[in-house]
Amino acid sequence: MKYHISLRTSLFRKLCLICLMGFISLTNINSQPSIGSFGVWDRGETMDINEYPFIKGSSCDASWNQVEKMSGVYDWSQLDQAVERASMNKTSIYISFAAGPESPDWIYTNGVPKVVTDNIRHAEKFPHYPFYISPEYQTYYHRFLTEAAKHIKSYPEEKRKTIAFIQVKTGCTGDECAYKGEPLDQKFSLEKSDPKWKKFRLETFEFYARLFYLDTDLKISLLLNSVTLESEGVKNEYVEEWNWATTTLKDGFGIKNGALSRGHHLSGERLAVNDFLPYLVDPKGLTLFRRSEMDQTWTRPWYQLNVPLNFYWGAINALNSGQSVWDITNVAIKASKEYGFDYTFYFFNKYAGQIFPETATDAFCALHKGLDAADTIAYPENFFGQAKKDNVVRMEKICASYSKYGAANDDKKALTFGQVQQRGDQTGFNDVGWEIWPDNYSRFLYQIAPDETSIPLWRIGGRITDTSSIYSRFARGFEHSTGKDALYFKLHEGFSQDAKPKVMSITVVWYDSIAGSTWKLDYDAGNANMKTAITVTGKGDKKWHHEAVTLNDAVFRCGGTKGSDLALVNTDDKDDIFSLMEVHRGEQVLPLLRPTAEVRVIKGYEKGIKYGEEGDESVRIKKKMEGEKNKEGDKQK
């Protein structure tokens, strides 16, 4: 069926564009969210910041079907309350205007075709969808967005300032696909790569930009999903969208990447870090911010092996990728306090806003090695086998070469999973993956020549259980027998800007495994030789410890051994183990930020629920639909 633009539709569009051009200024404006708003956010609007003070902001989805239940009648009460609450709490908020399957039903009796798909998992939540490219849909959709912009402009300035950004949602939720599943009637098909769908998305981007970003009365930054720059040797489907964003939103914009904060060693994370990090941390020119959310991944089998540990390394992974905003579900926020893993949220807040080295107050390096089977230089094909995502033999061979240091693959089936299936169905810790992050995780603090001077370690203290320390997942250490007796570190250029003595505080997290073992922390004090800050002797208690020291004469201009600012040095023939180093500009901040000594096991989830298992939402919906179908059949009989 063909859809023709009616005279009424055409006139409305023209009037919209004329009105828009009347109040839009096309000058460049600085509309980036405040760095102070970066950190952990409440994914809804329900959590009390007095009880959970780590919350930096919240989200409000003013969905079309809730705002405009009757054509032309708008109820903005939900949005008003959310903005008022953010203003009262002096926190931030981001807004989205979900449409697509969350469009009001009246549009389907006013010319918009209704689309039904074969997807069972989302059938209850999204029973139908609009045909996005129909002129009638776009007319009503644009009218709704225009009214949204008008309403936001009606807020006083102090309330508008609470709005950090607006997430652009063109399709289903924020996933940027037209439908969940395939349309039963294929004439409504709109694949992600379909030129018609790309055209619709770009036109929607343009409309949002005119309303919210280029309007000098609003100047609200936009967050986009499915925009990717060109990567060498990689086929990216969203380069056109990236090019539009970088030429239109010249002061910067936000990107969505959900996976990086939901775990570690996830397939494809290396590219997600490398592609965007130059625009997120110490950017030179175009500046982006990055948001992702914690969904129900933390209730799945892999996370439930040790919830505090997995949250911690998920946060570390996200910070390493330059993540700015981390949306957390209210259930996870409540559990974090009850079970003592809210330390991770405070840690994330500490570093999320450290964007520019000249003004950063903190830097960290979390010691880690990921065995990336896609790396043919580190793991040559002539020895380890062909580099293919499904080559489990290659992955196992790579892992075996590090097994003496604790590397293992607990769930071999999951080695070939994509990151979505990993999060849902993986049941163990794997130290090999495909395009996983291979190096240390860091922000402004880097280890010099890690593999030449130290050894990587996994599962420190033995098999990881639900009560293992968060630090036991990864570490690095000395290996005296091979001459690896020091770990050298340097700060990002600009963190320490001159050769004058400065006050800097250092924290080192280490594992005390050998009684009588000794090591020291040296630093660059501007002299020919490095100066010793502390010397530590182990007790052999098999526990993780924090050593903290404040330096009053730190120069940190890479004047130490191997061009280092700091060094962990072995002072005997025993091998010590380290997990984390932090640098703080100034005196130590009190009270000191530390994880709970005792890891508390979360009750009620135990083994976690895989996708499609009893208890999973998709199974419940499927059974409900089958039951309704059987009832209908009985009636007909």
Regions found by a protein language model. Give the residues of each.
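N-terminal substrate-binding region of glycoside hydrolase catalytic domains
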Residues: 32-132, 295-299, 323-333, 345-346, ...
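Extracellular beta-strand ligand-recognition surfaces/modules
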Residues: 547-581
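Glycan-recognition and processing domains
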Residues: 383-494, 582-584, 590-597
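Short, surface-exposed beta-strand/strand-loop-strand elements in extracellular ectodomains
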Residues: 516-529
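Substrate-binding cleft of secreted/luminal carbohydrate-active enzymes
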Residues: 94, 98, 250-431
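An active-site-proximal structural segment forming one wall of the substrate-binding cleft
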Residues: 87, 125-167, 200, 204-207
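Extracellular carbohydrate recognition and processing domains
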Residues: 528-560
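Substrate-binding cleft/loops of secretory-pathway carbohydrate-active enzymes
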Residues: 167, 172-178, 189, 193, ...
